Amino acid sequence: MKAKLPAERRGFLTTRGHSRLTKLHYGRPEFHYEVWHHTGDGRLEVGLHFEGAADANQRAFDFFRSRMVEVKARLPRAELEPWDRGWTRLYETLPAPQLDEQVLDAGVETLCTYIITLEPLLERFERS
């Protein structure tokens, strides 16, 4: 995956969730990219999650909501929504009845597009 990212985006850190969940971030684990295989639904979720303090998550929601036209120009299937425990996510799902090579390739491509598109906006948000 790193080879598909620009050099300045290759220095991410990773954490594992449960068996079919991976998170990666650039120094703030509460704001992370996530890939999660929802086995029961047969879907692969790819997105940017805001799982920090409720006020920070709300500010992130407001920031990205005002930029959804820009986001959807590169990520047309992306949805922004409040989520569990006061969290927020900007994500999409892909069909994934099984984690086969085709699904993994699509997940990597989608995740790379999310990072390339959203990380500059996330950096701008964090400076605001």
Model segments located where?
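Ampiphathic alpha-helical segments that act as solvent-exposed interaction surfaces
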Residues: 1-2, 63-75, 95-128
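Short, intrinsically disordered low-complexity segments
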Residues: 81-103
